Amino acid sequence: MSRVIHISSNEELDKHLQAERLVIDFSAAWCGPCRAISPVFEKLSNEFVTFTFVHVDIDKLSGHPIVKEIRSVPTFYFYRNGAKVSEF
């Protein structure tokens, strides 16, 4: 069972940005590499249970300021206590 939270609103994303340890998967339904990496992301969510794992479809949340930063998918952001610490 996956622990990945699928974000459906800007408010929900803002709430999760304050998590102690957060990993965000930015992707799109039309993106083949995104679909390929999804099972790995889900597996990692079960292995690293002290982290919050969320999935953001960039086409559904295109108005969020963080989503506007995304230039390619998949993109992963890592946050700790509300601050971005890394990305790839």
From Swiss-Prot:
<feature type="site" description="Contributes to redox potential value">
    <location>
        <position position="32"/>
    </location>
</feature>
<keyword id="KW-0249">Electron transport</keyword>
<feature type="domain" description="Thioredoxin">
    <location>
        <begin position="2"/>
        <end position="88"/>
    </location>
</feature>
<dbReference type="InterPro" id="IPR013766">
    <property type="entry name" value="Thioredoxin_domain"/>
</dbReference>
<keyword id="KW-0676">Redox-active center</keyword>
<feature type="active site" description="Nucleophile">
    <location>
        <position position="34"/>
    </location>
</feature>
<feature type="site" description="Deprotonates C-terminal active site Cys">
    <location>
        <position position="25"/>
    </location>
</feature>
<feature type="site" description="Contributes to redox potential value">
    <location>
        <position position="33"/>
    </location>
</feature>
<dbReference type="InterPro" id="IPR017937">
    <property type="entry name" value="Thioredoxin_CS"/>
</dbReference>
<feature type="disulfide bond" description="Redox-active">
    <location>
        <begin position="31"/>
        <end position="34"/>
    </location>
</feature>
<protein>
    <recommendedName>
        <fullName>Thioredoxin-2</fullName>
    </recommendedName>
</protein>
<keyword id="KW-1015">Disulfide bond</keyword>
<dbReference type="InterPro" id="IPR005746">
    <property type="entry name" value="Thioredoxin"/>
</dbReference>
<feature type="active site" description="Nucleophile">
    <location>
        <position position="31"/>
    </location>
</feature>
<dbReference type="GO" id="GO:0003756">
    <property type="term" value="F:protein disulfide isomerase activity"/>
</dbReference>
<keyword id="KW-0813">Transport</keyword>
<dbReference type="GO" id="GO:0006457">
    <property type="term" value="P:protein folding"/>
</dbReference>
<dbReference type="Pfam" id="PF00085">
    <property type="entry name" value="Thioredoxin"/>
</dbReference>
<dbReference type="GO" id="GO:0004791">
    <property type="term" value="F:thioredoxin-disulfide reductase (NADPH) activity"/>
</dbReference>
<comment type="function">
    <text>Participates in various redox reactions through the reversible oxidation of its active center dithiol to a disulfide and catalyzes dithiol-disulfide exchange reactions.</text>
</comment>
<dbReference type="InterPro" id="IPR036249">
    <property type="entry name" value="Thioredoxin-like_sf"/>
</dbReference>
<comment type="similarity">
    <text>Belongs to the thioredoxin family.</text>
</comment>
<dbReference type="GO" id="GO:0045454">
    <property type="term" value="P:cell redox homeostasis"/>
</dbReference>
